[in-house]
Regions:
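N-terminal soluble domains immediately following signal/targeting peptides that reside
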Residues: 1-130
């Protein structure tokens, strides 16, 4: 299972520029660690999925960021599942990880087609099978 996530910096850390205070530096590092860990995404246990650490690109937060630019996080992860046919759902923990996040749009592409599910706070469950 391949996963891609794009999250605006404002929703993840409350700002979209290079950190200007020690607190912002810590907040940015924490957000990167949470996204890297992959703990915000839990596949159905029956599928037996594992993933190496995700790849996280934090764009717009370094010293070279354009003033007034847009900062965001792009995350990719590849899960390997022992029983992919049993991958019926996901639990998305982004609301717990990022308290200002209000909505997550999940685009799902499977062998049986494509669909979209919208999660509004506090929803966390995504159904993958029809």
């Amino acid at each position: 299972m391949d996963v891609g996530l794009s999250i605006p910096g404002h929703d993840a850390v409350g700002f979209e520029h290079s950190p200007s205070t020690p607190d912002q530096t810590l907040t940015l590092a924490h957000a990167k660690q949470v996204l890297l860990s992959g703990t915000w995404l839990v596949p159905a246990a029956a599928a037996g999925c594992v993933a190496p650490p995700a790849t996280v690109v934090a764009d717009g937060f370094d010293a070279n960021a354009k003033p007034g630019g847009h900062g965001d996080f792009d995350v990719t992860a590849r899960f390997t599942c022992a029983s992919p046919a049993r991958l019926s759902s996901l639990e998305i923990g982004l609301f717990a990880a990022f308290p200002t996040l209000q909505r997550v749009v999940v685009d799902i592409v499977t062998a049986s087609g494509a669909t979209e599910q919208v999660l509004d706070r506090p929803m966390t469950h995504v159904t993958l099978s029809p």
